[in-house]
Amino acid sequence: MDSYHGTTILSVRRGREVALGGDGQVTLGSIVVKASARKVRRLYKEQVLAGFAGATADAFTLFERFEGKLEKHQGNLVRAAIDLTRDWRTDRVLRRLEAMLAVADRDTSLIITGNGDVLEPEHGIVAIGSGGAYAQAAARALLAHTTLGPAEMVKKSLEIAGDLCIYTNQHHTIEVLTDPEPVSQ
C-alpha cells in the first residue's frame, strides 16, 4: 500500500461554520499498527484546522513548517499555503515527503500537495486520502439534502468512508471553527 493514501480526512463548510475531521487508523502495509492516531490539529492560535493523509513523520514535519508559514503571514491561509508549496517543491528534503494536507480557516478551505498544488475545492468540501472519495460523495449528498451542521456531516461521512475503505476506521477526531454572529447595533 502506498502510505500516501492510507486515511480519510474531510472538511465541510456550511454557513458560518467549518468542520475538519479524520479517522485514526495508521497502517504499515496491510497491518493496522494504531487505531487512534490524531491526524487533525488546530494551528495558528486555534484559528486554522489542518489534517493530513500520508506518512506520519512527514505530516508532522509539514504541520510544523505550515505553522511557521502561518506565523510569517499572520494567519493568512492562502499566502501561507502558497509559501509552503514553494518550499515543498524546491527543497531537496521536503520534496521527498509523502503527504497531503487539508486545511481550513473561517473563510477558506484548501488542499495542499507536494506537487505544488494549492486547491480550493468546490462546494466547501475538502477530502483527501484513500477514503476521501467516499467521504466526499457522502458529504455532498448530506450538504444538498439535509440541514445537518458541518460537524455532523463530517462524522456521518467519515462513518460511511470507514465502512467502505479498508484503510479508514471508525475512530474519529473532528474539530470545528464557528464564526460568531456579527453584533447588530
Curated annotation (Swiss-Prot):
- Annotated residues that bind Na(+) are located at 162, 165, 168
Q: Which UniProt keywords apply?
A: Allosteric enzyme, Cytoplasm, Hydrolase, Metal-binding, Protease, Sodium, Stress response, Threonine protease
Briefly, what is this protein's role? Protease subunit of a proteasome-like degradation complex believed to be a general protein degrading machinery.
Which reactions are catalysed by this chain?
ATP-dependent cleavage of peptide bonds with broad specificity
The UniProt record lists the EC number as 3.4.25.2
Localization terms from the record:
Cytoplasm
Q: Which species? A: Methylibium petroleiphilum (strain ATCC BAA-1232 / LMG 22953 / PM1)
What GO cellular-component annotations does this UniProt entry give? HslUV protease complex; proteasome core complex
Task: List GO molecular-function terms, semicolon-separated.
Answer: metal ion binding; threonine-type endopeptidase activity
Q: GO:BP terms for this protein?
A: proteolysis involved in protein catabolic process
Q: Quaternary arrangement and interactors, per the entry?
A: A double ring-shaped homohexamer of HslV is capped on each side by a ring-shaped HslU homohexamer. The assembly of the HslU/HslV complex is dependent on binding of ATP.
HAMAP family on file: HslV
Spell out the disulfide connections.
none
- Tagged with keyword Metal-binding: yes
> According to its UniProt record, which residues of this chain constitute the active site?
7
**Pfam families to which the protein is assigned, alphabetical:** Proteasome
Q: What is its main location?
A: cytoplasm
What family does the entry list?
Belongs to the peptidase T1B family. HslV subfamily.
Q: What is the protein name for this chain?
A: ATP-dependent protease subunit HslV
